């Protein structure tokens, strides 16, 4: 009786182990065997070409440390925002199109490598979008947030091809920086040039208004002309005083002197002329005083326009110099490498990782099955 009771758990244990064997083989043995065969025999070598660069700008007043201080000691500081711009550009479709114009990228990635690693190994999707997604996975651009240094890594099936892609990407990044420089310089200088054009237009308009006013009012030198008119009035008044004095003497001595009527006519004529000259000088809307105010207003407007033009031209010269000084530069710190050893795939690591993941999956499924059976019982 005791022997029979002891045999029952043994049979149950064997039955349980038999049921678990297919699950263990499915989750652990088969994936591990496939991983060992693939990574041990078929997986193609992948070479990683690496380079590093930094985008720098003329030195600012900010204080930096490390590599930033090193760049400042040479007169430049890092420009991290623009480094991120280069990073995004290198991983963009635009950069891929530029690369394909000079390198046979599809040939690099579709005619070499094993079926699982190469592009479109099973001939299912040969579109440009599929190739872009594939190439994006073979490219990495990491930026150090502290130093601002970017590291570019290109994964390829051939060391020389990876080197060529890396080198070409650096040139494309430099071209991007040059385009950004040119665009910023063009926009800045165009704004300053437009200010000069506006100032020149204002000078021409005020000068034309002043010229038309001079022609209309027959003014060539208003201060000199006003001075002549004042001198004329002064002379007329002196002449009037002389005539009045002479007339008074004649009237007191010989009232019937025939010169008296002539002097009286002369006196009347001088007074009329003095009144007319005085009226022209300051008596009506077209007087010299009014003309002087209008003339001075036009002269002031013209002088201000000339000053604005001079300031705009000075600003344009300064802007050109500043635009030249604010150029960005892509400085290559380490040139693209041409590796002689395939860093990928990590064959042993991948096999062990497959085994461990299979064990974890097996354990989870085992617990799940046991829980379901216990629930049914």
UniProtKB/Swiss-Prot annotation:
It is found in: Cell inner membrane. One of its GO terms (biological process) is polysaccharide transport. The keyword Transmembrane applies. It comes from the Bacteria. Disulfide bonds: none annotated. The keyword Cell inner membrane applies. It is a multi-pass membrane protein. The chain crosses the membrane at residues 23-43, 351-371. GO terms for cellular component: Gram-negative-bacterium-type cell wall; plasma membrane. Signal peptide: none annotated. Its main location: membrane. GO terms for molecular function: carbohydrate:proton symporter activity; protein tyrosine kinase activity. Keywords: Capsule biogenesis/degradation, Cell inner membrane, Cell membrane, Membrane, Polysaccharide transport, Sugar transport, Transmembrane, Transmembrane helix, Transport. NCBIfam families: BexC_CtrB_KpsE. May form an ATP-driven capsule polysaccharide export apparatus, in association with the BexA, BexB and BexD proteins. Belongs to the BexC/CtrB/KpsE family. This is Capsule polysaccharide export inner-membrane protein BexC. It comes from Haemophilus influenzae. The gene is bexC.
């Amino acid at each position: 009786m005791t022997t029979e009771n002891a045999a029952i758990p043994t049979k149950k244990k064997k039955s349980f182990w038999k049921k678990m064997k297919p699950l263990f083989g499915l989750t652990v043995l088969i994936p591990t065997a496939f991983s060992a065969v693939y990574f041990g025999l078929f997986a193609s070598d992948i070479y990683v070409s690496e380079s590093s660069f930094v985008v720098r700008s003329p030195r600012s007043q900010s204080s930096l440390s490390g590599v930033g201080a090193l760049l400042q000691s040479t007169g430049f500081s890092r420009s991290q925002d623009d480094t991120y711009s280069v990073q995004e550009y290198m991983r963009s479709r635009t950069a891929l199109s530029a690369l394909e114009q000079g390198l046979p990228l599809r040939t690099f990635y579709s005619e070499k490598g094993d079926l699982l690693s190469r592009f479109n190994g099973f001939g299912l999707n040969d579109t440009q979008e599929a190739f872009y997604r594939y190439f994006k996975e073979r490219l990495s651009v990491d930026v150090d947030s502290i130093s601002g240094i970017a590291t570019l890594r290109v994964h390829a099936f051939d060391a020389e091809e990876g080197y060529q892609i890396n080198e070409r990407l650096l040139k494309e990044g430099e071209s991007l920086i040059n385009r950004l420089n040119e665009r910023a310089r063009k926009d800045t200088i165009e704004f300053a040039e437009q200010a000069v054009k506006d100032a020149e237009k204002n000078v021409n308009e005020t000068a034309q208004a002043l010229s038309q006013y001079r022609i209309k009012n027959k003014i060539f030198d208003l201060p000199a002309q006003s001075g002549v008119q004042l001198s004329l009035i002064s002379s007329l008044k002196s002449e009037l005083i002389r005539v009045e004095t002479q007339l008074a003497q004649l009237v007191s001595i010989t009232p019937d002197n025939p010169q008296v009527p002539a002097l009286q006519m002369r006196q009347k004529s001088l007074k009329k002329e003095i009144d007319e000259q005085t009226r022209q000088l300051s008596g009506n809307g077209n007087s010299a005083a009014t003309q002087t105010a209008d003339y001075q207003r036009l002269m002031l407007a013209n002088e201000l326009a000339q000053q604005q033009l001079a300031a705009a031209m000075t600003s344009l010269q300064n802007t050109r110099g500043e635009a030249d000084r604010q150029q960005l530069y892509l400085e290559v710190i380490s040139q693209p490498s041409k590796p002689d050893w395939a860093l990928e795939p990590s064959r042993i690591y991948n096999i062990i990782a497959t085994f461990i993941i299979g064990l974890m999956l097996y354990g989870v499924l085992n617990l799940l099955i046991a829980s379901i059976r216990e629930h049914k019982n």
